[in-house]
Amino acid sequence: MQQDKVNLLGLNQKAIEDFFISIGKKKFHARQVFKWIHKKGVIDFDAMTDLGKNLRHKLKDKAQITIPKVVFSKASKDGTHKWLIDVGGSAVETVFIPEEGRGTLCVSSQIGCTLNCSFCSTGKQGFNRNLSAAEVIAQLWIAARTLSKTDGEHDFTVTNIVMMGMGEPLMNFENVVPAMDIMMDDLAYGLSRRKVTLSTSGVVPRIYDLLEQSGVSLAVSLHTPNDMLRNEIVPINKKYNIDELLEACKLYAQKGPHKHITFEYTLMEEVNDNLSDAEELVALLKSREVPAKINLIPFNPYPGTPYKKPSNNRIHRFKEFLQHNGFVTTVRKTRGDDIDAACGQLAGDVMDKTNRKQRYLKKLGDTNAN
């Protein structure tokens, strides 16, 4: 039966080699198929012209290459591209952000999120399930094929990956790590560890595991230097406080690919954007001796949120203070907000997740969505 077949899409190189050995075939055949899937975008075994007829027949009997369907894709006026992808009746979003000299793909790891950060629209959906490794890597496969100019063969339009979409990737460690392995494999997408960034709200034990098993670039959603406030807006802080988090970050910076940690800081008016917050942040990072870059993210309002985006003056003042104290600081530009693709808007209209697919089809005028 179809559901009993192994989906080769989500297998990293070692796993696909193990599968081929299990069906009595050679490792080099596995590498051929792996390259066809990810480098060339081919998912039909019969189109893999360097495979023998008997092998193709066996693969059709034992395996499949299943790509989730795209419910819709839409480009923003600023060039940002968004895909809504059907994953077993639910939907996740993937966003491509073009910039001069690079193209960044923001990838989701869960349907919804377990952490319920108070300012995050995705968390308001609740949590459905983890994505499989195939569903994670499918987002890159789809983007690479859509954006490619070489008739399906990956041409590195996507130069950077950020695991910053829907969900907390370290809460789906077992599926996210193999997917990132594929992203970095030279037979697939060939991205370096420096070009793949995982963003976490602070699942501290898994940060150590990530360093040992993957070593991609790390970004941490800090949002405040104050434990009391962080307990409120990032509830996982009650389990792993700022001291524990920064201890893990310090080790990661020493051994990771960038020798620093990027700290993400969502600025919310009169919540964490005061000069006193900036002073406390500087004191914290200097006292813990964590090499840091700081990425300030002006809050993107969504229906029902009590939080507000700070004025440009307040954002500038916060940034200037950090820079004056020696920290490389950037302000994330709002991109794709006309298609609900900006950071923090990945929950669309913040409605029940079970209706997301129907809502988006309705937006496109599909009468079958009702």
UniProtKB/Swiss-Prot annotation:
Q: Which cofactor does it need?
A: [4Fe-4S] cluster
List locations, semicolon-separated: Cytoplasm
Q: Per UniProt, where does [4Fe-4S] cluster bind?
A: C113, C117, C120
Q: Which reaction equation describes what this protein catalyses?
A: adenosine(2503) in 23S rRNA + 2 reduced [2Fe-2S]-[ferredoxin] + 2 S-adenosyl-L-methionine = 2-methyladenosine(2503) in 23S rRNA + 5'-deoxyadenosine + L-methionine + 2 oxidized [2Fe-2S]-[ferredoxin] + S-adenosyl-L-homocysteine; adenosine(37) in tRNA + 2 reduced [2Fe-2S]-[ferredoxin] + 2 S-adenosyl-L-methionine = 2-methyladenosine(37) in tRNA + 5'-deoxyadenosine + L-methionine + 2 oxidized [2Fe-2S]-[ferredoxin] + S-adenosyl-L-homocysteine
Tell me which SUPFAM superfamilies the record gives: Radical SAM enzymes
Q: What else is known?
A: Reaction proceeds by a ping-pong mechanism involving intermediate methylation of a conserved cysteine residue.
Q: What name goes with this protein?
A: Dual-specificity RNA methyltransferase RlmN
Supply the source organism for this entry: Francisella tularensis subsp. holarctica (strain LVS)
